[in-house]
Amino acid sequence: MANNHNTPNIPLVVHVGFSGSRRLLPEAGNQSELLRQIESCMTDALQAIPEKFNLNNNFLCGVSQLAVGADTLFARVCQEAKIPQRVFLPQHFDEFVNAKGTQGSDFSESEKEQATKLFGSDHVIQQRVASSSNDRTTRFEQTNLEILNASDVIVCLLREDAKESVAGAVGMLKRAKRRNIPVLEMRVSVDNGIATTKDIWHNTEHFQAPTLPSQFNELEMVPYDANDGLPDPIEYCTPLKQFASSEANWYSKWFHRAAAIIILTHVAATIVATIGLLTHGSNHGHGEEHHDYVFPIIELSLLLLGLGFHLYLHWRHIGKSWAFVRLIAETNRSVSAVRKINCGLEYLFRLPLPSELKPVFRSINVVHLNATKSGADEQWETCRDEYLSKRIDNQLAFYDDRYLRAEKWRKCCSWMFTAFSTASVLIILSNFLGDQLREHIPHWVAGLGIIFPVIAVGAMSLSAAADLEARSETFRSTASFLREQRPKFEDAMSMNELSQLALETEERLLGETANWFSRRSYLGVA
């Protein structure tokens, strides 16, 4: 099924960032009932977001702190609506709920109990400390900035007279408006014992729905059903990996075949032209002048064939498309390898990967966090053994094999260049021999002096087009890294150590693919 511009073929996440006032209501009135009414307004606002932005085949993920007041309401709304939530905190949770500001403790005992329950709720898929500053204001500001950077849409729930603070919800609202991030400003008011919100959207025209790169237009549709919850990482990644692997194989074959044809046709054209020059005139005087056109016609046909393949490679962007889909395939293999390991996938966002892939990576990260949130440490040894056998050992065998193959072809191309270049030099030097010695050299040897340099350059062109030098070194160094990592995995003593080693390994493996992508995308045959 072809891709609709507004409907991604796999479910993609839309992050809804949140910030709000700690105290939403005046002291008077039935606080619990008023908060319930505000919570209802927030539920309606969140449920309206997909329709507001015409989202199809997308799922929401909340991103917020877990302070008292508005943050607590947002967490409850996400919990009731079964929206996964990532919680970013300015400090470790125990310190956070016991912190004190200028007006005393941030949390009362009942608020602390409620926050603790929400923090351990099944809908919370990540608990992350977003700041290491010793300054309280800086901690809250840095956390809000992290929420802002992670969000596609922002919701700010503010009391009617909320004042601006660089580290508060009004500051978040102001920053979102300046950065052209769509933001819903919800101002709370109480009239005759009824709490309502005045909702004002800003920057809606700047919303960009997450989409798949155009290379995946023909990916079969995988619909998302909110009632089924988020898919398993394997279930989510498999369609992408299979499609990308199939496309990568097709592009790879086309690129290598076209590269060989382009180079060989130009070498062959040179050989034909040289033969034509050497035999020129042999047909004259025999009434067969039309034979003079045979070699030019053959040469022209070969050159046009090579040129045609060259233009096709550039017109279809074969090299870049191949690199792109292979990068997707390797990313999904990487994520599948750590699917049982309790860790975030931050390395996907640290590596220099194409920005078009950000929606996919963010969605994969949410799916992975949801699947590993429980983190059963008692089974970490089983996870380690599986990772060793299915990832480390498999990749080690792969890189060893590819290193030997790349090195063999690199040496072959290098030998051809040296041999034919040396032969060309010797042929040229033969011109400096005496007349008597030159008479014994067949006249066709001069033609080899034209052909051999072209063959030498052709060998180097094949080596460059296949990226043999860089691939050989990459395969060797990566295999060496995996050999060093393996004993560390065997000696690991906990899930934390396993997670650290796995993330280090995956960042290195995917980093090598990212480096290859950068070279391959802009490295053609000619």
Where are these predicted regions, by residue range?
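Acidic/glycine-enriched connector segments
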Residues: 2-197
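Conserved non-transmembrane functional hotspots
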Residues: 201-526
